[in-house]
Curated annotation (Swiss-Prot):
Binding locations of 3-phosphoshikimate: K8, S9, R13, S149, Q151, D296, K323
Keyword set includes Cell cycle: no
Similarity-based family: Belongs to the EPSP synthase family.
Protein name per the record: 3-phosphoshikimate 1-carboxyvinyltransferase
Species this chain originates from: Thermotoga maritima (strain ATCC 43589 / DSM 3109 / JCM 10099 / NBRC 100826 / MSB8)
Gene3D superfamilies: Enolpyruvate transferase domain (3.65.10.10)
Subunit description: Monomer.
Pathway: Metabolic intermediate biosynthesis; chorismate biosynthesis; chorismate from D-erythrose 4-phosphate and phosphoenolpyruvate: step 6/7
Highest taxon in the source lineage: Bacteria
EC number(s) per entry: 2.5.1.19
Organismal lineage: Bacteria, Thermotogati, Thermotogota, Thermotogae, Thermotogales
Length: 410
């Protein structure tokens, strides 16, 4: 039995929505990591009052006041993009900045729709942080996103809460739906039809919520359970939102000994995942519609592919190049260092199965998810894997190595 840390995506949204509510909220089981601390601290600087700890936090919203200092987003793209949507709807001036990694990630995709709504932005060349926002009284828009992005969709929807008129977001494919799901449960008029989300401006009262375990964190252990000899792993109290279970769907397509069930609903579906050693994995071409639903987990498919029969192919995943690192390049370069044959595409990769991972040293380039991936690879390698600067896992999963050690011992 394994419990993974609370969900990072939902923690960000719970903090933001509780700060936007009209009355106090009580939040249970929030994830405390470097990314979510940035969201918490920014909301505090804007005037929100927090009491308690991350296991039980009371949130007392206040009207936002213009901050004197620039607001630090650290390494958190979610903080930057979601707070851009919120701040665009307040008639005040704010500046967002981040660490060197975040300052290389593109912000044009969120600036464009928010400027169409009436906010003004000024950013570095090529629309990188730091970024100044002059908020305004916004107008609702109908916007087609160029890529399926839950962060862009959420930024526009959060801005639409205080806009005049209806806000519509249309995506090329479905992305994570935490924001619209939570808003709807809070009584905000939200309609979802396929990849189209329609929101009417609204206010809402405070709420009580328990954050489920993070399926993206559980994914590392679920994959380990499938590829490690004599493994049996059960993950409990984990979020099973259908827009987050893409990896589980792909593992079933590959023939993994895997099952999951929903045991309760609390704004989000929560349940249990069970996995056992899966010696008969088969390579797959990951279906295009699943790619946006597992964007953070796609590199793990390469690890599954090493042990599968036949070819495993990921395409239409160019978004991976715009994460904390260029995850396609970092994956391919480091797998080759470990003796794994892998082919790189502009929008993905291909790996031929039934290989072995010899071992060696890798550099995740400060990317928390890549560091965790290579650590899992080390456990199924011949000689072990040395992961440079592995402390970067604290961005999303501070006790990853402690939990990994427990799993290996048991």
């Amino acid at each position: 039995m394994l419990s993974v840390p609370p969900d990072k995506s939902i923690t960000h949204r719970a903090l933001i929505l509780s700060a936007l509510a009209e009355t106090e909220s009580t939040l249970y089981n929030l994830l405390r990591c470097l990314d979510t601390e940035r969201t918490h601290d920014i909301l505090e600087k804007l005037g929100t009052r927090f009491e308690g700890d991350w296991e039980k936090m009371k949130v007392f919203p206040k009207p936002f006041a213009e901050p004197i200092e620039p607001l630090f987003c650290g390494n958190s793209g979610t903080t930057t993009r979601l707070m851009s949507g919120v701040l665009a709807s307040y008639e005040m001036f704010t500046v967002l900045y981040g660490d060197p990694s975040l300052s290389r990630r593109p912000m044009r995709r969120v600036i464009e729709p928010l400027e169409m709504m009436g906010a003004r932005f000024m950013a570095r060349q090529n629309n990188y942080l730091p970024m100044a926002i002059k908020g305004n009284h916004l107008s609702g828009i109908s916007y087609k996103t160029p890529v399926a992005s839950a962060q862009v969709k959420s930024a526009v929807l959060l801005a639409g809460l205080r806009a005049s008129g209806r806000t519509i977001v249309i995506e090329p494919a479905k992305s994570r739906d935490h924001t619209e799901r939570m808003l709807k449960n809070l009584g905000v008029p939200v309609e979802v039809e396929g990849t189209r989300v329609v929101l009417e401006p609204a206010t809402f009262r405070g709420f009580t919520m328990k954050v489920p375990g993070d399926i993206s964190s559980a994914a590392f252990f679920v994959v380990l359970g499938a590829i490690h000899p004599n493994a049996r792993i059960t993950v409990t109290d984990v979020g099973l939102n259908p827009t987050r279970t893409g990896l589980l769907e792909v593992m079933k397509l590959m023939g993994a000994n895997l099952e999951w069930e929903i045991t309760e609903e609390n704004l989000e579906p929560i349940g249990t995942v069970r996995v056992e050693t899966s010696p008969n994995l088969k390579g797959v071409v990951v279906p295009e519609h699943l790619v946006p639903l597992m964007i953070d987990e796609l590199p793990l498919v390469a690890l599954l592919g090493v042990f599968a029969e036949g070819e495993t192919v990921v395409r239409n995943a160019e978004e991976l190049r715009k994460k904390e690192s260029d995850r396609i390049r970092v994956l391919v370069e480091n797998f080759k260092r470990l003796g794994v044959e892998i082919e790189e595409f502009k929008d993905g990769f291909k790996i031929v199965g039934k290989q072995s991972i010899k071992g060696g040293s890798v550099d995740p380039e400060g990317d928390h998810r890549m560091a965790m991936l290579f650590s899992i690879a080390g456990l199924v390698s011949e000689e072990g894997v040395d992961v440079k600067d592995h402390e970067c896992v604290a961005v999303s999963f501070p006790n990853f190595y402690e939990l990994l050690e427990r799993v290996v011992i048991s």
